[in-house]
A protein has these predicted regions:
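An N-terminal assembly and electron-transfer interface module characteristic of large anaerobic redox
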Residues: 1-446
Length: 446
């Protein structure tokens, strides 16, 4: 049967504003700048509140994934606001193409739009799986490079801020510096700069040096890692501002980068061919993508270490953890799959043994690869202090935070039992000058 939904045509590029749901605020802000560089008019949504969830429940079945409820509710709330010309507005949503129900969000969104009286609004699909060929956003090499740069930069900024903010002497210094660099990077990407490997290698040490120059007092704090379903893990709307809550409890938070999920998806393409057979072309392409990403991953790890920050484990080492620990097989790749288990193992091994596993209620991959692995990880690492938290329209924020507080109480008790290091640790000196003003171009003087 022929599809009757409206399509986003090339001529709409100049006439329509595209609304983007806000999953990963830092990375998506740079990604939005990349779309503007390609001639699109875009806006990253920031609306939140109870009405978003209520609209999601009204127009989507309540048994559907919580992230779907929120994304669709956020779109409908924005369209109801009166801020947009509804004849010149479009929406965009991602599709993984995997077995997770997230691949069906676009159909649920179209159905909800029709019910709500917005059936004329086209929806684009952002995917790398060849889905929605008549309504997908065109992917050229330049856009893919800019998208990767958005994630590289976003992960770096997120990591630097998270490891600086809990110890800063001047409240808000790390947040302001992150916003400063976001403004610079977005401006550069809009003007078709800043995303080449050469430019990123030159700029990243400068960013790290400025964060390292922020006056801090390194005192022992509870370190908490956050893992889980990708939307609930990163979105403040999806996890009730989990990172902000943990900061209010005087914790240092480690939120593994979004690039790990991209690498996970590429690795799974190659692993599928190895396990079940298939296209060698796809396997070769996936391995080439992993090699490309690994090159910049080394730059980020070196940048963090040189500036005195904790760096994540290389993906090539991360993929060994599940099978080395006999926890889960690499063929388990629905949703976040084995990556979720691997991230918990890495966090515990690197000193972030207190972990919040954020999961939408009823998310089968999370219950198997997250909650289902907790006992096994505790057997391997008795110090692991892991609490799974369900996020759902019916789950109250107070109950979620109380469960996290119980986990933190155990963490603080263990911290007090340890031998405390000196209150003021010497700052790590870097060879990169931190006295930088906003450059006219990131390419300047390279």
């Amino acid at each position: 049967m022929e599809q009757t939904y409206p399509r986003f045509t090339p001529d709409m590029k100049k006439t329509h504003k595209i609304l983007i749901p806000n999953m990963a605020p830092v990375q998506f802000r740079i990604l939005a700048a990349s779309m503007e560089n390609h001639g699109y008019q875009v806006e990253l949504l920031g609306n939140c509140g109870e009405r978003v969830a209520e609209l999601g429940l009204k127009y989507v079945h309540n048994d559907t994934c919580y992230p779907a409820l929120l994304v669709i509710g956020q779109f409908l709330d924005a369209l109801d606001s009166g801020k947009y010309d509804l004849d010149h507005t479009a929406l965009i949503i991602t599709q993984t193409g995997g077995g997770c129900r997230a691949s069906n969000y676009i159909f649920l969104l179209r159905k909800a739009l029709e019910k709500a009286g917005y059936g004329n609004i086209p929806v684009l699909s952002l995917n790398f799986s060849g889905l929605e060929k008549d309504s997908s956003m065109p992917m050229d090499l330049k856009f893919m490079r800019q998208a990767l740069a958005a994630i590289y930069y976003g992960d770096l900024l997120m990591t630097l801020r998270a490891q600086t903010q809990p110890y800063e002497l001047e409240a808000g210094a790390a947040e302001r510096l992150q916003n400063k660099w976001l403004d610079i990077l977005c401006d550069e990407v809009r003007h078709d700069k800043g995303y080449s490997g050469r430019e990123m290698k030159a700029v990243m040490p400068r960013i790290a040096a400025e964060f390292a120059a922020i006056p801090v007092r390194r005192v022992p704090k509870v370190k908490v890692g956050v893992v889980g379903e990708i939307y609930v893990k990163y979105s403040p709307l999806g996890n009730n501002e989990l990172e902000k809550f943990l900061a209010s409890q005087d914790c240092e938070v480690n939120l593994p980068g979004l690039m790990g999920f991209v690498q996970y998806c590429a690795y799974n393409m190659a692993e599928t061919v190895r396990l079940y057979g298939g296209s060698l072309v796809e396997k070769t392409a996936a391995e080439a993508a992993l090699a490309l990403i690994a090159g910049m991953e080394k730059v980020i790890i070196k940048t963090l270490k040189d500036a005195g920050y904790h760096a994540p484990m290389p993906f090539s080492e991360l993929i060994k953890l599940p099978e080395q620990s006999h926890t889960i097989g690499m063929g388990c790749k629905m949703g976040e799959g084995w990556l979720l288990t691997a991230e918990m193992l890495e966090l515990v091994r690197s000193g972030y043994e207190n972990i919040v596993c954020a999961q939408p209620f009823g998310c089968l991959p999370n219950h198997i690869c997250g909650k289902g692995m907790v006992n096994k990880i505790r057997e391997l690492y008795p110090e692991a202090n892991i609490t799974p938290i369900d996020y759902d329209p019916s789950a109250t924020r107070v109950n979620q935070e109380n469960r996290i507080k119980l986990m933190l109480a155990v963490a603080r008790e263990r911290l007090s039992e340890r031998r405390e290091p000196p209150a003021d640790l010497p700052k790590v000196r870097t060879s990169v000058s931190a006295k930088l003003s906003k450059p006219k171009s990131l390419c300047a003087n390279i």
